[in-house]
Curated annotation (Swiss-Prot):
One of its GO terms (molecular function) is ATP binding. Belongs to the SecA family. Disulfide bonds: none annotated. The lineage of its organism: Bacteria, Pseudomonadati, Pseudomonadota, Gammaproteobacteria, Vibrionales. It is found in: Cell inner membrane; Cytoplasm. It is a peripheral membrane protein. This is Protein translocase subunit SecA. ATP binds at Q87, G105, E106, G107, K108, T109, D513.
């Protein structure tokens, strides 16, 4: 009550922010007459002037009013477009490292030019991030004339660019690209073997367009660079044949109830689990088909891989539906459909064997599984930027998440013209058939009065179902979904013409405005070298049609189902009513819709259906509240999942930072001999300690064992017995020194044969490749650990704490193994001449580069942080564990502090 009263008196935080920014808008507007009087050359010279002032110590905030005024004036001259005051406010919000919520049609692309120009002045580069290649290329080409007029360079970052072109693109002042490509470039840079092969420079400032889609919808989907693993396509095919024999059980097993079904499905969390009966039945089938020994169990450590395959096949059959989650294209490939945009994602593959299981289910060629070489989530990639900002039409519903995870405040920017769209209440029918009949009637009415309609569906399957119903009703329409995305621009250009009917899966076509009356630009582009008269005639004709559409009520939005997230519903609505245009929207629902079926209580469902007759609709505030409550519930659960995922990924992220910093250090220096020398001392000392324990009696020494170990591991012939016989006063410390000195002498002899520089290059090459191999193994071990960690909850242990503890132990093993493996390789290598080492180094590099070339970028399946594990605790990461290892005292501490281990957590040991 008091909060509401205070808000009325002093305004909300958003109101106060807007008041503060409007004062700066006045300042920018005051520069307008002065800048209008400047010649083109004088206006262009402003960029050089601003850069000089920055060098003299002026801040970007101090330059902001003049810089924004410069961009606005340049835009007027280049495009004949003047930034509105609300766009200036949006630009300031972005410059402040915040999220600007701007409605569809308010000119987000033009708004982004303001902070992009200002933040490109220091010369560190600005990244403008979009959701797909088409938008990245379109926005770069649209804004290129403006930035080049002001003396700035513009680049585009899209997949499959040649390395040199990509490197040049990153040197541009302003770089447009997709979120995936920026993330993958970061991972690829951290797999490179030479500095000149890296493309990215520092991550200074990013403007993320459609920020909700990238930082929220895709937050659960890690980016993965993977390489080929072993072929197990036959196993997928054989297990795929068993799954159709399993029966679904509606209720979970409990102490009081044990069903006779084989698996249960949790639709809320999108999980499928084998029941006890199911496990026994699958084991029987496996034995019968020669996949398992009699009396063996699926959950024994030796059968981990079989359980993994069964789970993948079960998920493929039960949770993943053709034409909803994926399509099979003409080439017989399974292509993922993005659940948020309805677009296909060629080249992306689900991980953990799921893609292969779907291929087996569809009977197409099964491609090899991949092994993770590097991975990162968008959450952690975008937090690497010094300053991050974003734009979207719908962020307010997720403002809390942006603030708590990314530290980004959301500012709602007012529209340039008042919004007059009529958002009508939802109507609910008993069945889907009744709902579709009502939608067809609504569309008929709109077509008759010449009003364009955009119909949003949640899947390809539903869009085709509706399309067939419209064909029967003889209503002409266009379908925009993953199957027909090649015609996307053409369909969107026509979607605003009188009486047009467009069915769009989810938010396909997002990023392109639907212009009432159709797109006159598309008609102009269709002409070859159009004259001014032709362009004027097209514009005049368009104006007439535009006014006609406005009179008919503007664009009408029909939602065929409520999405789990209110934000996606708002995005669909936001396609209408742009820039103060007329428009309307309505959602048609049925009690068979998944959201209502899963999340509405049985009491509410029976209450609604009891008084309804066939074809009758219900409009109820209580029902609308119930639906919104269900959506909030789902949003809350999804937020918790993303937050938990981040907490787990933060553990890997701290370790990733240590590994990548070590890699950076190795890449930036030519001579790592000091590091090698220190590592050699640490490794040999650790081995000596095993056979000659510190401060022990001579009777406890295993001299023969030590001699054999030094020979086997390091090819070192140390005559320790002889030394002890020759000098009976040779004590433990002096002996240690003697062995270390001998190892150094032997190594120095190699250096004399091949030359110092050749050996330095070889050391660096061995160190980098060993680090990459161990990191790859470590990622696999972390995956296995993660999948089985939820089982610790049954032992009254905190899975998160256990995960942190065990992953730290794994990381200790990695750092110790790095030293041991590098010293072993360098010690055992035998050389006669310089050319041999050069040839070996070239061979190792060629192998590594071939592996990198064969690596592919992919998305993992969206993760649940505590999903049902496919591994038992014992089998989860056993093969990867290196026992009896410790972090080297001079290594970076795995906690990520940046200090040496001995000066940080090493003090505690």
């Amino acid at each position: 009550m008091i909060t509401k009263l205070l808000t009325k008196v002093i305004g909300s935080r958003n109101d106060r922010t807007l008041r503060r920014l409007r004062k700066i808008v006045k300042e920018i507007n005051n520069y307008e007459p002065t800048f209008e009087a400047l010649s083109d050359e004088e206006l262009k010279a402003k960029t050089v002037e601003f850069r000089e002032r920055l060098e003299q110590g002026e801040t970007l905030d101090k330059l902001l009013p003049e810089a924004f005024a410069t961009v606005r004036e340049a835009s007027k001259r280049v495009y004949g477009m003047r930034h509105f005051d609300v766009q200036l406010i949006g630009g300031m919000v972005l410059n402040g490292g915040q999220i600007a919520e701007m409605r569809t049609g308010e000119g987000k692309t033009l708004t982004a030019t303001l902070p992009a120009y200002l933040n490109a002045l220091p010369g560190k580069g600005v990244h403008v991030v979009t959701v797909n290649d088409y938008l990245a290329t379109r926005d770069a080409e649209t804004n290129r004339p403006l930035f080049e007029f002001l003396g700035m360079t513009v680049g585009v970052n899209v997949p499959n660019m040649p390395p040199q072109a990509k490197k040049e693109a990153y040197q541009a002042d302003i770089l447009y690209g997709t979120n995936n490509e920026f993330g993958f470039d970061y991972l690829r840079d951290n797999m490179a073997f030479r500095n000149e092969d890296r493309v990215q420079r520092e991550r200074f400032f990013a403007v993320v367009d459609e920020v909700d889609s990238i930082l929220i919808d895709e937050a659960r989907t890690p980016l993965i660079i993977s390489g080929p693993a072993e072929d197990s396509s036959d196993l997928y095919t054989r297990i795929n044949l068993l799954i159709p024999q399993l029966q679904k059980q509606d209720k979970e097993d409990s102490e009081e109830y044990r069903g006779d079904g084989h698996y249960t499905v949790d639709e809320k969390s999108k999980q499928v689990h084998l029941t006890e009966t199911g496990q026994e039945f699958v084991e029987e089938l496996m034995v019968k088909n020669g996949l398992m020994e009699e009396g063996d169990t699926l959950y024994s450590p030796t059968n981990i891989s079989l359980l993994h395959h069964v789970n993948a096949a079960l998920r493929a059959h039960v949770l993943f539906e053709r034409n909803v989650d994926y399509i099979v294209n003409e080439d017989g490939e399974v292509v993922i459909v993005d659940e948020h945009t309805g677009r296909t994602m060629p080249g992306r593959r689900w991980s953990e064997g799921l893609h292969q299981a779907v291929e087996a289910k569809e009977g197409v060629k099964i491609q090899n599984e991949n092994q993770t070489l590097a991975s990162i989530t968008f959450q952690n990639y975008f937090r690497l930027y010094e300053k991050l900002s974003g734009m979207t039409g719908t962020a307010d519903t997720e403002a809390f998440e942006f603030q708590s995870i990314y530290g980004l405040e959301t500012v709602v920017i007012p529209t340039n013209k008042p919004m007059i769209r009529n958002d009508m209440p939802d109507v609910v029918y008993r069945t889907e058939a009744e709902k579709f009949a009502a939608i067809i009637e609504d569309i008929k009415e709109r077509v008759e009065k010449g009003q364009p309609s955009l119909v949003g569906t949640v899947s390809i399957e539903k869009s085709e179902l509706l399309s067939n119903a419209l064909k029967k009703a003889k209503i002409k329409h266009n379908v925009l979904n993953a199957k027909f995305h090649e015609r996307e621009a053409e369909i969107v250009a026509e979607a605003g013409t009188p009486g047009a009917v467009t069915i769009a899966t989810n938010m396909a076509g997002r990023g392109t405005d639907i212009v009432l009356g159709g797109s006159w630009q598309a008609k102009v582009e269709a002409l070859q070298d159009p004259t001014k008269e032709q362009i004027d005639a097209i514009k005049a004709e368009w104006k007439q049609v535009h006014d006609q559409v406005l009179e008919s009520g503007g664009l009408h939005i029909i939602g065929t189902e409520r999405h789990e997230s209110r934000r996606i519903d708002n995005q669909l609505r936001g396609r209408s009513g742009r820039q103060g245009d007329a428009g309307s929207s309505r959602f048609y629902l049925s009690m068979e819709d998944s959201l209502l079926r899963i999340f509405t209580s049985d009491r509410m469902a029976s209450l609604i259906q009891s008084g309804m007759e066939e074809g009758e609709a219900i409009e109820s505030k209580m029902l609308s509240r119930s639906i919104e409550k269900a959506q909030r519930k789902v949003e809350g659960r999804n937020f918790d999942i993303r937050k938990q995922l981040l907490e787990y990924d933060d553990v890997a992220n701290d370790q990733r930072k240590v590994v990548y910093e070590l890699r950076d250090e190795l890449m930036s220096v030519d001579d790592i001999s000091d590091m090698i020398e220190q590592n050699r001392e640490d490794v040999i000392t650790a081995i000596i300690d095993e056979y000659i324990p510190p401060q022990s009696l001579e009777d406890m020494w295993d001299v023969e064992g030590l001699q054999e170990r030094l020979k086997a591991d390091f090819d070192l012939d140390a005559p320790i017995k002889q030394w002890l016989e020759e000098d009976d006063k040779l004590y433990e410390e002096a002996l240690r020194e003697k062995i270390t000195n001998l190892a150094v002498e032997v190594y120095k002899a190699k250096e004399e044969v091949v030359g110092a520089q050749v050996l330095r290059n070889f050391e660096k090459s061995v160190m980098l490749q060993t680090l990459d191999t161990l990191w790859k193994e470590h990622l696999a071990a972390m995956d296995h650990l993660r999948q089985g960690i939820h089982l610790r909850g049954y032992a009254q242990k905190n899975p998160k704490q256990e995960y942190k503890r065990e992953s730290f132990e794994l990381f200790e093993g990695l750092l110790e193994a790095l030293k041991t493996d590098v010293i072993t390789v360098l010690s055992r290598v035998r050389v006669q001449q310089q050319e041999e080492v050069e040839r070996m180094e070239e061979q190792r590099r060629a192998q590594a580069e071939e592996a990198a070339r064969r690596a592919q970028a992919q998305h993992a399946a969206a993760q649940n942080p505590l999903s049902e594990g496919e591994e038992s605790e014992e089998g989860a990461h056993q093969p990867m564990v290196r026992e009896e290892r410790k972090v080297g005292r001079n290594e970076p501490c795995p906690c990520g502090s940046g200090k040496k281990y001995k000066q940080c957590h090493g003090k505690i040991d």
